[in-house]
Amino acid sequence: MKLNTLAPAAGSKSAPKRLGRGIGSGLGKTSGKGHKGQKARSGGYHKVGFEGGQMPLQRRLPKFGFTSASKRYVAEIRLHELNNVVADEVTLDTLKDFGLIRKDIKTVKVIASGEIQKAVSLKGIACTKGAKEAIEKAGGKVE
């Protein structure tokens, strides 16, 4: 088998519809658009969500909620993920280097999920009460 001999299975691909190519094709003259009307014209169709002048659904339903723009740059990291960091001092940059958080993250919080097996020193990183206790119990410290 060679890449240049690969072909789809017989009957798995259908030929594209050739519109407006004579009455024998079955899609001649009006090309499957019927007679007249807005939808038969070139470029003619209503915009998405238009309901013929009736108040559209997305305007009938109430607005709600709010998404903080700064929330995009905040991340949570679990306690057991700190085991993957091969460094004694854990900062925002070391977490980025080891691929635990995205490059655009500005604030991180360590949460108590899982167990930590080694002593690490957190610098400039927030953590929950439970996570702080677990880190200090493992011989690490939070600064």
From Swiss-Prot:
It holds the Pfam family Ribosomal_L27A. Residues 1-52 are annotated as: Disordered. SUPFAM superfamilies: Ribosomal proteins L15p and L18e. GO terms for molecular function: rRNA binding; structural constituent of ribosome. GO terms for cellular component: cytosolic large ribosomal subunit. Keywords: Ribonucleoprotein, Ribosomal protein, RNA-binding, rRNA-binding. It comes from the Bacteria. InterPro entries: Ribosomal_uL15, Ribosomal_uL15/eL18, Ribosomal_uL15/eL18_sf, Ribosomal_uL15_bac-type, Ribosomal_uL15_CS. The keyword Ribosomal protein applies. Residues 21-31 have a biased composition (Gly residues). GO terms for biological process: translation. PANTHER family: 50S RIBOSOMAL PROTEIN L15 (PTHR12934), LARGE RIBOSOMAL SUBUNIT PROTEIN UL15M (PTHR12934:SF11). Part of the 50S ribosomal subunit. Binds to the 23S rRNA. Belongs to the universal ribosomal protein uL15 family. This is Large ribosomal subunit protein uL15.
